[in-house]
Amino acid sequence: IGITGSKGKTTTTTIITHILKELGYHVFTGGNIGIPLFNQIENMKKEDIVVLELSSFQLMEMPVSPDIAVITNISPDHLDVHGSYEEYIHAKKYIFKNQRINNKLVLNHDDEIVKNFSKEAKSQVSFFGNQEIKDGFYLKEDKIYYNEEKVIDTNNLMLKGKHNYLNICA
């Protein structure tokens, strides 16, 4: 699982890791989050899950895409390195560039640029956001829903703030 975006990468990576561990999966977390995975490769098994926080710089060097890719949002960032906002957006697309039809791409429906990535995806696409979404998680009236079914009341969450609730939806 790879997570990228201008904001929310670390939080979303941490949330996904926590949820998977709570469900009983053996999870390795790394990438831009500061945990080197190279030393852990020998300990990994085929059934283990790797959750990676991926920066635009890392994405440009990747010859493969993760089976599940998440894009939290995009706003002008690192323009000193990328040269332009368009180049930065292009770099973020590398997370799904090499996905296959049986892979999954999770996009922020509230971010027009990110939402439009669905037009270029070869993989299955689902969305998350602030409005009702078919086949996706969304935030409505302090509750998180999936396909119109309430999953949790945000008052029951330790993390606070609308931005964190959207990270949970991702």
Predicted regions and their residues:
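Phosphate-binding loop of NTP-binding sites
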Residues: I1-H109, I113-Q124
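Adenine nucleotide phosphate-binding catalytic loops in nucleotide-utilizing enzymes
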Residues: S84-E86, K93, S123-A170
